[in-house]
């Protein structure tokens, strides 16, 4: 989401008539939510279990992607991005811990490193996705200026639902 939003705001901002302050809040809202999630997710996962919380996190990611894509106002976009921020913050804390707990000592470092690498690859994929949708925007009715930003946000649903499904294995 953090990578996607850079391409989204040039379309969503004008659609919702956002001023600079509102644009700033939409862009930064996941960071605030992530801080809150980071503060509580460790203790919560100690009580409930990391895997259970990570399943909820995956669901929140998927929900946030769809809610962002279908936002009809500044407020709904802001709330949807806050939900995504909660998921992101919890995942940053819990995923490496969970991986370390379930992996054997010979593979632990490699597996946690791969998880961190996947975060960076996700940012790269987001930028490529924005580029792709912007290029489609100029050649396709389906990706017009009015809805291309919705596709940019909605495409996040794909990795989120894969994450959700794989958490059950």
Whereabouts are the PLM-identified features?
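Transmembrane-helix signature of 12-pass secondary carriers
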Residues: 1-169
């Amino acid at each position: 989401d953090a990578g996607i939003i850079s391409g989204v705001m040039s379309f969503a901002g004008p659609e919702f008539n956002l001023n600079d302050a509102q644009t700033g809040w939409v862009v930064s809202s996941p960071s605030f939510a992530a801080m809150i999630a980071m503060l509580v997710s460790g203790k919560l996962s100690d009580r409930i279990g990391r895997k259970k919380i990570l399943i909820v996190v995956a669901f929140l990611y998927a929900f946030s992607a769809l809610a962002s894509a279908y936002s009809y106002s500044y407020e709904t976009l802001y709330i949807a991005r806050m939900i995504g921020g909660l998921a992101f913050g919890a995942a940053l804390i819990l995923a490496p811990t969970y991986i370390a707990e379930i992996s054997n000592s010979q593979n632990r470092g490699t597996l946690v490193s791969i998880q961190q690498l996947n975060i960076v690859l996700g940012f790269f994929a987001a930028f490529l996705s924005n580029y792709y949708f912007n290029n489609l925007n100029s050649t396709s009715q389906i990706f017009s200026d009015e809805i291309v930003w919705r596709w940019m946000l909605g495409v996040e649903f794909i990795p989120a639902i894969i994450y959700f499904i794989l958490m059950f294995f």
